[in-house]
Amino acid sequence: MSRGKRYNGSEHKLNIKKVIAVIIAFLVIIMFVAVFIKLMQPKAETTEKKVAMAYYSAFTNNKWGIIDSSGNTVITPSYDEMVVVPNKDKAVFIVTYDVDYTNGTYKTKAVNEKNEQLFSTYDQVEAIQNYDQQNNIWYEKSCLRVKKDNKYGLIDLSGKVLLDCNYESIEPLIGISNSLITTKDGKKGLVSSTGSVIIDNEYADIKSLTNEYENGYIVK
């Protein structure tokens, strides 16, 4: 009579260990695949809200300086004359100094947010001021008037030359933005604030038809 195989307890425990090991290995594989899939998925773009910085003239203790839109002092008030901000979005400021009220003379220069001089190759750098019928004052935002060897030209706020210093004067067409009257050899002409010639220097006088430059000009 044959006898049945006797139960081997150690072999049973070994089989259980193998099953557990297989399960653990399977779970590790699943975790690895899940991590891999997550890494392969495109990351959601995070958008940061950026607040545009703006600059303004500031008057404190009878001195002029510059502050930013957060109220921080950019240039400590130290100037007797107002520091002009042609374009509030650009850190280019015009300061007036060595003013002689008796003789009506003064000097101007451009500085940056560190109060360092810009465009120093020119004898004078000015913002171009204009006004309307209600005496509201504004400045051309995209250009500056520069002087060299007693002649005037235009640059943009990065220093790029828009018009060479070949003109006896460059003045705004009063009440009209983006329109500047140039004088060369005693004749009037018209350019835009980007330096584009609109009317050649061939006339005694130039006036606007309306308060919108698109509506045309009268030349004499």
Please tell me what each predicted stretch does.
Residues S2-K220:
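Residue-level detector of conserved, function-critical positions
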